[in-house]
Amino acid sequence: MAFKDWMNNLRDYFVEDDEEFNEPARPVQESRPTVASTPKPKVEERKAQPEYQTRRPAQSTSKAQTQTAAPKRAGSTFTKPMPEKIVQQQTVSQSQSVAATVSTIAIKEPRAYADIMESARIVKNGECVLVNFKFMGDAQARRSIDFMTGVVFTLDGDIQNVGGQIFLMTPANITVDAAKEMSILAGQNFESYDIY
């Protein structure tokens, strides 16, 4: 009886508090074929398996322990790959979310001041807009640039003169390398559309 009490105490030490353990341990120790027919004792023995392996050199191994240790090893290997599968699923979902966040640039050529509202809505939705004022008069273009500057300022974005009558409006999460832009624009006369 002392050995049985010692085994129960050892099992209780390794069984977590949230797991319920049924007490059909007496039939399990009396006849091994009943253990094979009932699935719950197998699950409990798998969880208790590491203590048998760690204590085995100190104890004398019996035939019953060696027979039950082999199925436990097979059961314990099935639980180890599961976290790896979860990690793989997370990386797939992360790559899918990265592919879903591809930025687009809308190109607009407004003909009147009222057409600028569509460009402002696009920037508000987090996309870039390239606006070409070639079909708009000088006074309306200046007024539109003032409006777009206010919209981009409110959204904490940026507006840049890309060339001639073309302006790029970007939301807050997108930056443009201004050094390359300034080297392209160097020496060209864009004073009539300068927003700075």
Curated annotation (Swiss-Prot):
Signal peptide: none annotated. Residues 16-81 are annotated as: Disordered. Its main location: cytoplasm. Residues 56-69 have a biased composition (Polar residues). One of its GO terms (biological process) is FtsZ-dependent cytokinesis. InterPro entries: Cell_div_SepF, Cell_div_SepF/SepF-rel, SepF-like_sf. Keywords: Cell cycle, Cell division, Cytoplasm, Septation. One of its GO terms (cellular component) is cytoplasm. It is found in: Cytoplasm. Transmembrane segments: none annotated. Belongs to the SepF family. Cell division protein that is part of the divisome complex and is recruited early to the Z-ring. Probably stimulates Z-ring formation, perhaps through the cross-linking of FtsZ protofilaments. Its function overlaps with FtsA. Homodimer. Interacts with FtsZ. This is Cell division protein SepF. It comes from Lactococcus lactis subsp. lactis (strain IL1403). The gene is sepF.
